[in-house]
Amino acid sequence: MKNPFFKPNKSELIFDGDYNPKGLALNLNYGDIFSNIGYIKFDENPFKTIDISSLQLGLNKNINEQTKAKISFAIYDFEKVKEFSPNQITWNGKNFGNSIDDNGNYLYDFSLMNLSLEIKTKMMSLPTTFFLDIVNNSDADENDRGFQSGLSLKINEKWKFTYLFKDIESDSTFGALTHSDFGGGGTGHKGHQFNLSYPVTERFSVDVVWFDNKKKMITDYNKILVDFKYKL
């Protein structure tokens, strides 16, 4: 199914954009208030399926004629990750930046608290989106925080430009699920990301993405990616 949770400007801080979870989800709305409840699964490896219990509460509010804001708080609780090794959980046996203990198992579990904010308005008559996404893993003793913030500008009817800065510490979120291209994928990276998007047709679009990152917080990582997207 499509990811049911609100992610500001399609943030990939916790979930990669290509992740389509399996499981159950319930969406509830009452006036400006919305909520998303989910029981989803991460099952890349046949040896072990990780269950994720989740709850998101939020507010979607029109500030004035041209500005609206959306804010939410979410909890994502991963079931007993630290009892297992990446070989039992991820598709290729890699830990994707998360800390490992002396036995080769995950050092921490993942109980994530997530604060998200998106403001849509106009800046110099251009449709503009400001966004902020913050995550904290309460089960980790250190390197437990991550965030990304930035803006998106619709330059004209076709072109859209997006800039963001991200700092995602090694145990702030589950590395196998976060953005698979930023810093080479996984956690423990920080830096800049620039996107230029062009819709060729209503269903087909092309994105050019430049990553200017610090891989593992110290090593330069620069990559240009051309992403072709087609909506079914």
Descriptions of predicted regions:
Residues G31, E65-T67, S85-L232:
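Outer-membrane beta-barrel pore domains
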Residues M1-F78, F147-G175:
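Outer membrane beta-barrel
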Residues V81:
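Active-site-proximal acidic segments at structured loop/helix or strand boundaries
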